[in-house]
Design a protein with these regions (language model features):
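Residues that mark the N-terminal boundary/hinge immediately upstream of a DNA-recognition element
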Residues: 5, 26-28
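The conserved cystathionine-beta-synthase
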Residues: 4-21
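Short beta->alpha transition motifs characteristic of CBS
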Residues: 26, 33-40
Length: 40
């Protein structure tokens, strides 16, 4: 599972979507997991 901070997610949504095609992306907020992005 890939991980990215909420700041990275907000600054590069295209990259997050690209990675999510291959594996779930955990988005963290202040170091704690808060959301998971997955492709459909």
């Amino acid at each position: 599972m890939a991980t990215m901070t909420s700041r990275e997610f907000n600054q590069d949504l295209a990259r997050a979507k690209r990675v999510a095609r291959q594996e779930p992306v955990v988005v963290t907020d202040r170091g704690e997991p808060s959301h998971v992005l997955m492709s459909y």
